Structure formats: structure tokens, C-alpha cells
Amino acid sequence: MRMRELAAVMAGVTFGMAVMPDMTVLAADNNMDYRRKVVGIAGIMNNTSTGLNDPVTRAEFANMLVKASTYRDYLPATSSVSVYADVPVTAQYASSIRIAAEQNWITGYLGGLYKPDQSITLQEAARGILALLGYTSEDFGSSLSSARMAKFYNLELNENLDRQPNEVLNRSDCINLFYNLLKTDYKTTGKAYATVLGCELNSDGEVNPLGLADTNLKGPKLVTKGSQIGDYVPFNVQEASIFVNGDASSYEALKSYVSSSYVVIYYNQTAKTIWAYIADEDVQSGRCAVRGTVENIYYSSSDVMTPTSITLDDGQEYKLSSSEMQFAFSVYGSIRVGDRVTLICEKSENSNGDATYTVVDYVED
């Protein structure tokens, strides 16, 4: 429903890069926030909002590699084969470890062990990333480890990644690593790896996941006050990346909001990402949700069939600019004066502080 208007905001593609010297820290923060959203929407990592300093295990990294590949569409929930003595078929990431091992993206240890709970190092991770890009052992001659790392640095896969080869990676490092992967050209095609997952690059060379967000975004859904969030999405909310009113948040924070407020959510099942908007919470600008009863529907004097705005019982005017919203509130649509609705709006303010609300979506009570 109404996905094209929403996808750009969900994907977070509007981040700008600060260029003034005294804005360096802000620029870095914005860049990381953008990367988190892209990697989350791409479905590579389940939760890009919390635990960013937590080390990533070899089992988790194998799962990330598979989810960053075309094998993601064939990843079974359980594995029927155990390829390592310390990875039983019942292990959480057994299927991903099997695929990663079969594709030679990541290797085990002597004695048939994988050591799934051991933290992944940059050198191990680099092997997997280069393999996804189409590089094999034949590309690196006899000095495999050093040649791989040289290629890794040459491709600038270490951008925003300040680790030595033998250092372990945390979740923040992996966000940067996989974002860099998406920007890097595939060995044989010369096209950005992002295209493998249905993304593309913007004109400035950054990843634009708009296609993924547009295709897989579900919603809006109105989560009633005091409800269980898990009843509204088809995945474990505690493993999700969560954004509240456009900012990175957490399950506990969203749970707290739902306990006392109505909340509108959108979600991407592939990426396990939730975008939530707290109803009637004041925001300076950007996306917001408003609940109320429709009091008036206004039409243009030149076109009495096409509504241009509505008012709710709060007295505020809400503009209708898209054809979908105009149809929904027209005589042909489903909304009438007196109906209870929740509007999802884009709020902007002029230099005088006067606010304008434009309706981009709605939920009928």
C-alpha cells in the first residue's frame, strides 16, 4: 500500500554529508547511521540498532555472508548435514556455516572443527568478502594471506574499518565491512555488488537500497496501546533493527512507547527492520503520526471531485498531494467525515515556524 511514497524515507536515503571542518563528527555519525540502515534493509544483519560493540562470532559471520549472497533465497531454517564436529545440525547457524564452508568463503580448523563461538578476525572476514566478490585462491598466488589483504586494502574494503588483520570484529565493524562490499565492483561484471541484492548506487557512489525497501516494505499497521508488538510482525521483534520517529532505537524503547501510546509501524521482513511512529508525538520535522476524527474534507474550486486537504478534530489542516491520498478521501474512497483515522504525515516548517502537514499514508480504525 502506497509504497513508492514511503520507500525513500524508510530506506533513509536522504542523509547528507557534512563538509564543513567543524562538522566532522556529525558527518561521521550521519554516515554510520546511513550505513546501518542500508545493511539492515539489505537483510545482511538482523539488528543494526543495538549491541554495536559486541564481538561477532564465526557462526554469526557465516550467516552474514550467506545473507549477503544469492544463497539467501535458499537458506533453510535447519540443516540436514553437519560439516564440522562442533556444529551440530541443530545449531542456530548450522545451515549458514554449511553453505559458507561449501563455497569456501570461510574455513575450519584442524580436527574438523569450526569454532563457531570464536570471534571473527579481519583476516578471516576479508577472505569471505573477497570470495563474494568473485575472487578465488588462484587470484592470490602462493602468499595467500598477504595477497588477500593487499587486494582487500586496494579495493578500499577497509573504509571506516580501523582494524589490524588479526583483530576481532564487532557488529559496528561488520556494518562498515558489508556496506563497503555493496559499493565495490564484482570481479567479473564490473558492476557494484549491491546489484546482486537488488540495490544500486546513487550518483555520489553511495548505496541506495530504495528498490529493496520499495519491494519488501509492509504496513502501515496501527499497534494499539498496551499491545504486544510481536503480534504485528512475522519475526522476532527482539532481533529486529528498530527506528522510532526516524532515529535508531531498541526493542525496550519501542515496548515502552506501545505501553502508553498508539504506534504506527512499517516493517521489512527480509531485513527484520521496523520503522515506528508514535501517534501524536510532536516532532520538529519529518515523518510523524496523528490520530483523530475527520471533521472536514476540502476540495479545490476548480475540481470538486479531488480533495486537497482535510482537518481532524484537532483543528489542524492536513494536505493531500498524492493521487492515492486524494482518492482515499474522495467520494470514491473509503474515508468519510466522522471516521476515526491515523494519518502518517510529512511535517515541514517555514522560517516563521509555521508547520505544514502532508498526508502520505493512513490507517483506518
Locate predicted features:
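A short macromolecule-binding patch
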Residues: 316-324
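OB-fold/S1-family single-stranded nucleic acid-binding modules
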Residues: 268-286, 347-365
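Short nucleic-acid-contacting surface segments enriched for D/E, G, S/T with interspersed K/R
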Residues: 247-265, 326-344
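Short aromatic-glycine-enriched beta-strand elements
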Residues: 301-311
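Structured, solvent-exposed acidic/aromatic patches
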Residues: 167-172, 177-179
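Feature responds to low-complexity, polar/acidic, surface-exposed segments characteristic
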Residues: 2-34, 40-62, 66-93, 103-123, ...
